[in-house]
Amino acid sequence: MDPVAVRPASALPPGAARCPHLFSPLRLGRLALPDRFAMAPMTTNFAGPDGEVTPQLCDYLAARGRGGFSLVVTENMGVHPTGRVMPRMVMADDDRRLAGLARLADAMRASGAKSIAQISHCGRQSKSKFTGMQLVAPSAIPCPLNREMPRELAIDEIGHLVRAFAAAARRAEAAGFDGVEIHAAHGYLVSGFLSAYSNRRTDRYGGSLANRMRFLLNIVDRIREASDLTLVVRISADEFVAGGNTLEQTTEIARALQAHGVSGISVSVGVYESFNTQSMVSGEAEGRWLPLAGRIAREVSVPVFGVGRIRRAAVAEAAVAGGECAIPLFGRAAIADPELPAKIRAGREEDILPCVSCNVCLGRAARPQTICPINPSVGRDREFGERLDSAAPAPLRIGIAGTCLASLTAAWIAAARGHDVTVYETEPDIGGMQGWRCSVPSQGEYGELVAAAQRRAAGAGVRILRRVPQAGECERLWAVRRFQPAGAGSPNCYDVLRGTHELPRGLDVLVQGGDLAAAEAALKLAAVGHRTELQTPLADICLDAHPGFRAIHRRLIPEHGGRVTTAVAKPSGTPAARAVAGPATATGGEVAPDDWAYPYASFGTADAYIDDAYEPSRMTAGVYEAAELAMAEPAPRGRGE
C-alpha cells in the first residue's frame, strides 16, 4: 500500500489537525475521495419484502452521506434468488431492480457521498424459508449454525452464478453507483469456495488454493471485461475455524486479486461459526483486527480497507498513519451517529453519540429492523427529524422522575419540541441501570452512553435536579420503572450491580442466574477478590443478550478467578457460600406485571412510565418507547395546580 500524502495543517478543516491522515485524499480506482471517512456495509432489513429499495433505506444511507461520510458501502445486495440471506435483503438480480437501485444511487449522490454497492450470494449461510428453495454451496456441507443441508453446485451452475455477479455489477453501475464490492468474506458463497473448511470439491473449483480462488477470480475477470469501474473485494483475513483460511492463504488471495485488476481490498474476519469475531461487544479492544489488514496492506499496492470496532477518530487516524489500512471502516459507529465525520471535522468529538457495541443493531438484523439505543432516529431518519422539528402546540411543564438512557432521551426530545422539562433524581448516580453497569469490569463504556444522553438533554435546555418535584412544578409527570424479573429475592444480582449489597472481601459467593445481569454480577464480585461461581440451569449464560457477551464473560469470569457452571439441575455451593440470586431463566416473551420495580413511586402518581432495563435490547426498546412518548401531544392534566 502506498504511503499517505498528508495535507499541511493550514489546509485542513477546523478540528482536523489531530488526525491529518484521516483527512488526507485518496484515489480508489476511478474515485477521488477527499478523506478516509467510510461507512461499512451492514444489513438493515430496510428493503421491501420483495427486495426492493425503499425510501426508508434511501433516507438512512443518505443521512450518513450528509453527516460527512465521503464513501458509503451499501449492505449486501443479492445477485440471484438462491442467494437471499435475509427476509428483506436488497436484490440486484434482475433488470426490474434498476429503477429502485437508481433511486438509492441518486440519494447517495445528493447526500454528497460516493457509493459502492456490495453484491453477494449467501451460499449455505441462510435458510430455505428466505430463498424459497434449497440452499446451494460449493459442497453439500451444512453451516453448523443454520444446520440446513445445501446442494452442491454443478459446474454449469457455477458459470451461471459468475454471470449473475457480473450482471449485478452492471446493474449497479447503470443505476449510478460509483463502484461495486464483491462480498467474498464471512462464509457466504464466494468465501465458501475460497475456504477448504467449506469447499471439499475435487474438480477445478476445489482442492488447491488456486482452484478454490477460481470462482472469485472468474467473477472479477467477467466484471473487468465489461467495465473499469471501481471494484473492491471483501475477504476474511482469518476465518477463526479449524481448517479455515488464515492470514497466509488470505494474503495469497489478495495478491491474486491485485493481479486481476481490483481497485481495493476490504479486510474483515470470520465466518458465521466465528461470528463474535466480526461483531465484537463492549469490552473488546478497539481496532482489534487492523493489524491483520496491515499485514495484507504490506503485500499489495491497492488501497486496503480495515475493520475491527473502529469508533473513535484516534483509532482510525492511527490505522492510516501506521499503514494498517488506507480506509478505516466505521460500522456500528455510523449507525449511532450519522454525523460522526462532520463532528470530528468541526472539532466537536465530545458531541459524538457513542457506539458501545451493545450489538442491538446486529441482533435485530434478521428480525424486524436495525435500531440503536443512543439514536432513536435510525430507520426513520426523515420522519424523526421532521417530528423533532415540529413544535409542541401546547408546551407543558414536564417532570421526569429518574434518570436512565430512556428518560434522558425523552427529556431531550420533549425539550427540543418546546416543553419545559425537568428531570428529578434522588439516587446517588445518574443513569439508572446503565449507570450501574459502568462498575462492571470491561463495561465502563456504558457510562459514555449516559454522559452523551445527559449532554444532549442539557443542550436542549433540560434541567436535572437532585430532589423530588414540589407541588405545582409539573403539569405532567413521567416516571422511570425498571425491568427487574421477579423471584430474584434479596440480595440479588441487581443489588450487587447497583452497589447496595457490599460483601467483605474474600468470600465464597454463589451467583444463581442465567441472564446478562447475573453474569456481570458474578464478574464484578470475582474482580474484587471473591471466590465466585456462576450457576445456571440453562445450557449457557447470557442467553438474553447478544452471543458476544456470552463469549466475553465466559472468558473474563475465569480470568478473574471465578467459575461458570451451566445446566445445573439444583444450585449447590460450599456450606459457607453467600448466595446472590438472579433470574433462573433468560428473560424473554411476555413480561409479567411483577417484573417491574417502581423506585420513584414516592414522587407521586405518574401520567406515564418510562422503561429502564439492564439487557441492551430491552434497554433499547425502552428508549424507542420513550421517544414516542415525547413525540406525542400530551393534553394538560393540571398536575400540581
Model-inferred region functions:
Residues 39, 265, 477-478, 584:
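Hydrophobic beta-strand scaffold positions of dinucleotide-using enzymes
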Residues 356-377, 560, 616-641:
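Flexible, Lys/Arg-rich cytosolic regulatory linkers and terminal tails that connect or flank
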Residues 308, 428, 465-468, 564-569, ...:
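Short loop/edge segments at beta-strand edges and connector loops
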Residues 420-460, 516-517, 522-567, 614-616, ...:
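Rossmann-like dinucleotide-binding cores of NAD(P)H-dependent redox enzymes
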Residues 300, 323-324, 460, 528, ...:
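Short, structured coil segments at secondary-structure junctions
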Residues 392-422, 465-472, 482-544, 573-581, ...:
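Rossmann-like dinucleotide/flavin-binding elements
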Residues 354, 365-403, 450-460, 476-504, ...:
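Extracellular/periplasmic ectodomains of large secreted or surface enzymes and adhesion receptors
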Residues 1-399, 405, 410-420, 429:
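Flavin-dependent oxidoreductase catalytic cores
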